Amino acid sequence: MKQRSLYLSLAGILAIFLTACGGKEEKTTTDSTSMTTDTTMHTTTTTPTTPAPAAPTTATVMVVKHKVANFNKWMASYDEHDSMRVASGLHNFVIGRGIPDSNMVMVAVKVDDTAKAKAFAKDPSLKKAMQKGGVIGAPNIMIFNTTFLDNGQATNLRVMTYETVKDWDAWKTAFESGKQLRTDNGLMDRAIGYDINDNHKISVVLSFTDSAKGMSFLKSDTMKKRMAAAGVVGQPNRYYYHVAKTY
């Protein structure tokens, strides 16, 4: 299984966790090391500083995932086309680089107007801009109604999970009841959301405070049973990444 081999290959690597943002994401510069080398998951236990948690905030967020031939070239092209995004009511938020493939890029932008965002996603000029930046293959584009769960602490090593659920409200109740269990197993809640067109399609973002414990818990029978009880249908689709840039 891909996930099992990923876990076995990553779980023993030494640790470097960088402090990242809260729900509103503090502004940082691009991670220059990650721009030139592949990203690896690090096994560590991290105890971040714990400021007072903020109240949950909400936003509409477009998430785009695609592979690039060269991250530096793509990043320059992405920055070059910022005015095109702004004109469509899209605002830079987070850029992530995949683990173990650091050329598998995730872009999250905040959305002012969903109609404009949908039109932007279908605009031929976007396709041309992506081709210029070295995007390989078709991008995966989704728009979520997102709730940021600012816990006052986070690391830049994260996992984004896509799932299908029977009922959003029932799933959300079950998810909230498992907060302490996740915390005890090296995971911190970052955000949850559902597709603007179908609230049975959801996303969950967690950050790792202990990568070995967190990875083990995500693959555990306990997690599988909790997901089943919460009404998750089928297998989750997980994207492991580190935050390369925030805005």
Describe these PLM feature segments.
Residues G22-R226, A230-Y247:
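Short S/T/G/P-rich N-terminal loop/turn motif that feeds into the first structured element of a domain
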Residues M1-L10:
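Bacterial N-terminal signal peptides that target proteins for export
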Residues F17-A20:
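C-terminal motif of bacterial Sec signal peptides marking the signal peptidase cleavage site
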